[in-house]
From Swiss-Prot:
The gene is atzA. Its cofactor is Fe(2+). AtzA and melamine deaminase (TriA) from Acidovorax citrulli strain NRRL B-12227 are 98% identical but catalyze distinct biochemical reactions. Enzymes differ by only 9 amino acids. These 9 amino acid differences between TriA and AtzA represent a short evolutionary pathway connecting enzymes catalyzing physiologically relevant deamination and dehalogenation reactions, respectively. Potential evolutionary trajectories between AtzA and TriA have been constructed, and catalytic activities of the intermediates along those trajectories have been characterized. It comes from Pseudomonas sp. (strain ADP). Homohexamer; trimer of dimers. It is found in: Cytoplasm. Pathway: Xenobiotic degradation; atrazine degradation; cyanurate from atrazine: step 1/3. This is Atrazine chlorohydrolase. Changing residue 331 to C: 4.6-fold decrease in catalytic efficiency with atrazine. Confers weak melamine deaminase activity. 28.5-fold decrease in catalytic efficiency with atrazine and strong increase in melanine deaminase activity. GO terms for cellular component: cytoplasm. Fe cation binds at residues 66, 68, 276, 327. Its EC number is 3.8.1.8. Keywords: Cytoplasm, Hydrolase, Iron, Metal-binding, Plasmid.
């Protein structure tokens, strides 16, 4: 039995009462929160280790509700100025094909270093390069070592609508030197591979790794494939996830919105999490709400690619579970939940011309308890409550940018940078303390970053991508 106690911190619990407890303690035993209280009212039990949280705010770990990890090695140049399909077919797919398993291992470690340093403890990795041999094994080995909580949502594509092909051919003319590649699979092959993946990895790493099926989009996956994913999720008591209405092509092809299309086939259910939802109207929001579908909003990525803004306030008003995802490492170019929270608040204030449309409290909920709800994991993570996993972060607000601070939620959402995250626990294990990562010691960090830079350059060269074009002011 291992015990740990965090003492004299300010707890932002995110429990159903949204209690904020000053000068409080949390007691952790074998990876779970077993007790908490206020020092003036109770005495914490003895512990093997005590973390002094004086001057710090203790929060549930941030939950990255939708992301693509490997593409972090494709950021920093080749994606800029590209719309969605241009970016997808001229950067993402060829870039991932040019990666080797050793590159994937470096990408995962780099991603986790940045994520943990911004307070992210859980990620929903939409693995769209799992088709390539060795990539899954390389990623899982690093996830197990690092200690983050991972939903490994294994994506699959089993059809390409002919109406998209002509558009793709035209876009390829922009980058003729880049090889066109396909990640299509036969439906039966995808089923077998995802089943084997789940059998091997679901519940491993002390229960931190989960495996979901992830049909890519309604236009890239057959109805048969989506029905199988839905049944798989039900039979194995997991979720399934899908990219929905990230571009307007889905509706053009179906002649109706993706939400309407899925409802026609009985594919909307409470185990489904959909990402993006940019090209949505009130009818689509109503359909998702009716079927208790969960949502992940990638607000920075959608803006980066010029796609648009999802109707998040309308979903929130209905009480839907909406989490925040940083999305691709190369369509955001950072893995910083605090930065994405700030952008989420600002863009919706601007779009709605309403300075109170999403409160900082709601934004913080979206990054924690609502993010957990969007993953169907709110019984285990997302709040500081007895019985839940000890995924906790300590923020030190004694920085110039967070001084003065009075309203905690507003300070975190609008003033913080991310470097205020001082200590991170996942399953009660300390994976960062005093900004020092357990899986990337300071004496190794510079050499590792140089290796990541070198590997990224080699990937772009193998894919014939131009990462540093001429200076362009317009």
């Amino acid at each position: 039995m291992q015990t740990l106690s965090i003492q004299h911190g300010t707890l932002v619990t995110m429990d159903q009462y949204r209690r904020v407890l000053g000068d409080s303690w949390v007691h952790v035993q074998d990876g779970r929160i077993v007790a908490l209280g206020v020092h003036a009212e109770s005495v914490p039990p003895p512990a093997d280790r005590v973390i002094d949280a004086r001057g710090k705010v203790v929060l549930p770990g941030f939950i990255n509700a939708h992301t693509h990890v490997n593409q972090i090695l494709l950021r920093g140049g080749p994606s800029h100025g590209r719309q969605f399909y241009d970016w997808l077919f001229n950067v993402v797919y060829p870039g991932q094909k040019a990666m080797r398993p050793e590159d994937v291992a470096v990408a995962v470690r780099l991603y986790c270093a940045e994520a943990v340093r911004s307070g992210i403890t859980t990620i929903n990795e939409n693995a769209d390069s799992a088709i390539y041999p060795g990539n899954i094994e390389a990623a899982m080995a690093v996830y197990g070592e690092v200690g983050v909580r991972v939903v490994y949502a294994r994506m699959f594509f089993d059809r390409m609508d002919g109406r998209i092909q002509g558009y793709v051919d035209a876009l390829k003319a922009r980058s003729p030197q880049v090889e066109l590649c396909s990640i299509m699979e036969e439906t039966a092959v995808a089923k077998d591979r995802i089943t084997a993946l789940s059998d091997q990895y679901h519940g491993t790493a002390g229960g931190r790794i989960s495996v979901w099926p992830a049909p890519a989009t309604t236009t890239a996956v057959t109805v048969e494939g989506m029905r199988w994913a839905q049944a798989f999720a039900r039979d194995r008591a997991v979720m399934w996830t899908l990219h929905m209405a990230e571009s307007d092509h889905d509706e053009r092809i179906h002649g109706m919105s993706p939400a309407e299309y899925m409802e026609c086939y009985g594919l909307l259910d409470e185990r489904l999490q959909v990402a993006h939802c940019v090209y949505f109207d009130r009818k689509d929001v109503r359909l998702l709400h009716r079927h208790n579908v969960k949502v992940a909003s990638q607000v920075v990525s959608n803006a980066y690619l010029g796609s648009g803004v999802a109707p998040v306030p309308e979903m929130v008003e209905r009480g839907m579970a909406v989490g925040i995802g940083t999305d691709n490492g190369n369509s955001n170019d950072s893995v910083n939940m605090i930065g994405d929270m700030k952008f989420m608040a600002h863009i919706h204030r601007a779009v709605h011309r309403d300075a109170d449309v999403l409160t900082p409290e709601k934004i913080l909920e979206m990054a924690t308890i609502d993010g957990a709800r969007s993953l169907g994991m709110d019984h285990e993570i997302g709040s500081i409550e007895t019985g839940k996993r000890a995924d906790l972060i300590l923020l030190d607000l004694r920085h110039p940018q967070t001084t003065p601070h009075h309203h905690l939620a507003a300070t975190i959402v609008f003033q913080a940078y991310g470097n205020e995250v001082d200590t991170v626990l996942i399953d009660g294990n300390v994976v960062m303390e005093n900004r020092r990562l357990s899986f990337l010691p300071p004496e190794r960090e510079l050499a590792f970053l140089e290796e990541a830079q070198s590997r990224a350059t080699a990937i772009l060269q193998r894919a014939n991508m131009v990462a540093n074009p001429a200076w362009r002011s317009l």
